[in-house]
């Protein structure tokens, strides 16, 4: 009987849902109101990177479902004003990000009260092995 309970415990423990993580992946923003491609990738060493109008990078920290971005730095390319505004708003949203959620190949970052940045794994992504 002890063996049965032990076996059942081990079986149920191994069925625990695998925790999803954005680390080692590259995503593309899929928010419909964004008229340009914006990417976001996560290196295993705590650095993130991406491309909007400019290439950008910085540091991220994940604890449970909370994500924070710091030290956002970018190149200094110029573009038409509406695209520059979209990029600035995107950077501000990343800075204000608080929680995230992952489902299959989607990543959602929630910021402020009602804002959501929604990403999908980039198909031609050169994912970084963990």
PLM features: what roles do these ranges have?
Residues 13-130:
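Lipid interaction determinants
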Residues 3-13:
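Sec-dependent N-terminal signal peptides
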